[in-house]
A protein has these predicted regions:
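Binuclear metal-ion centers of metallo-dependent hydrolases, dominated by the metallo-beta-lactamase
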Residues: 1-5, 84, 88, 93-133
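Core dinuclear metal-dependent hydrolase active-site scaffold
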Residues: 1-63, 129-133
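Short, low-complexity, polar/charged sequence segments that are solvent-exposed and flexible
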Residues: 17-19, 33-37, 67-70, 87-91, ...
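Metallo-beta-lactamase
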Residues: 39-90, 98-107
Length: 133
């Protein structure tokens, strides 16, 4: 699928959303148009899987997202603060931070949760142990 494409299979709609880097030093990692994030919708539930992206306008423009999966891992995606700011803009009901096992301090899931929950009582941050020791 290309950015902007959509398809429906077995009652599940899948829409490809751009994912890319904005920071100059990371633009070669994920070029706009090369990869996708996805919105998956079934029975009125909308799930957003961001892919390896930064806080891009296409993410900020999302509406009515029930569950979001947001990465935060420099240099490949975005810092904690940018991830939290994006989430506070498009306001999913529930957010799962992922792709956060990076350099010390650059992927602080607790800090992400604190920023989001301090600034919105309507967004639930769910922390899973994606990377057990």
């Amino acid at each position: 699928m290309n950015n902007g494409d959509s398809l429906t299979m077995a009652g599940i709609e899948i829409r490809a959303i751009p994912m890319y880097n904005l920071r100059e030093e990371a633009k070669d990692l994920h070029v706009k148009g090369r990869g996708n994030g996805y919105i998956i919708e079934r029975d009125g539930t909308r799930i957003y899987i961001a892919g390896d992206t930064e806080d891009i306008p296409e993410m900020r423009d999302l509406k009515n997202i029930d569950i979001a999966f947001i990465p935060m891992n420099l240099p490949y995606t975005m810092p904690v603060e940018a991830a939290a700011d994006a989430v506070l803009e498009f306001k999913p009901k529930k957010v799962y931070p992922y792709h956060y096992k990076g350099k010390e301090g650059l992927s602080d899931v607790g800090k992400f949760k604190n920023i989001v929950e301090t600034n919105s009582v309507n967004i639930e941050v769910v922390q899973l142990d994606w990377y057990p020791d």
